[in-house]
């Protein structure tokens, strides 16, 4: 578990992920979260790198999720994150991503963390730039790719 001033961030258990997936009403999210659970089950020794990470306030209120999308052969881990609409604009994304990226960059096999963001998602781009992520000049399926190295 990662704790910040206002947040608790932790990799969900198999049961928590199953419950979370079952509650999803958006098919594309349900499929993505199912793929994460499949990654966890296929790589139990690297659970954190495939799991849904829950973002909660200190009182246990669930406000969002983040995830790493595995580790590639170069030691790069992609992060994805989202904060529920009711909690946006309060710095929670910056706080959660700062803590998660700091944790990731302390891990032995990690050289950098990347994030792919929709070009129109100005708030998410601001979060990444504020945290020292730099554009790579590459465009992924969702949009520009940003990178932060050790």
Where are these regions (language model features)?
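Conserved active-site tyrosine of GNAT-family acetyltransferases
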Residues: 128
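GNAT-family acyltransferases
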Residues: 1-78, 83-86, 99-103, 107, ...
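Conserved GNAT acetyl-CoA-binding A-motif
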Residues: 107-116
């Amino acid at each position: 578990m990662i704790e910040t001033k206002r947040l608790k961030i932790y990799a969900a258990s198999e049961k928590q992920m199953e419950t979370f997936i079952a509650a999803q009403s958006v098919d594309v999210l349900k499929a993505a979260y199912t793929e994460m659970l499949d990654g966890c089950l296929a790589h139990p020794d690297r659970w954190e790198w495939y799991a849904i990470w829950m973002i909660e306030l200190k009182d246990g209120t669930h406000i969002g999720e983040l995830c790493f999308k595995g580790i590639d052969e170069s030691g790069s881990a992609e992060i994805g994150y989202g904060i529920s609409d009711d909690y946006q604009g309060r710095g929670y994304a910056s706080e959660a991503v700062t803590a998660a990226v700091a944790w990731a960059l302390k891990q032995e096999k990690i050289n950098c963390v990347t994030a792919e963001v929709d070009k129109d998602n100005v708030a998410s781009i601001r979060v990444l730039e504020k945290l020292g992520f730099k554009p790579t000049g590459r465009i992924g399926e969702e949009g520009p790719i940003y990178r932060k190295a050790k």
